[in-house]
């Protein structure tokens, strides 16, 4: 079972995704930008997949992905970035494996997770 860490500053989105992914059998943890040092929280959660929004309140998802890709203990992490604005090129250049344009259908996310 894959462990997925969700990072978003939208409580509603977090709860919706947590419920949908849980129903599909995934182990899900959530992380908000208010949770302190995001990198420490990612390490502590030890996920297989990180689904992260580009905009996390006062933190930037692109910067976090760049930090992950330069951290030897985290560079194996599969990263899915999401935003309501098409930032595909920026996300892939930062080190994301996949970009999802919001709103997306749950089946799109499930297909990516199964790939």
Descriptions of predicted regions:
Residues 11-29:
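Two-component/phosphorelay signaling modules centered on CheY-like receiver
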Residues 31-49:
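Acidic, metal-coordinating helix/loop segments flanking the phosphotransfer/catalytic sites
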Residues 57:
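The feature encodes the CheY-like receiver
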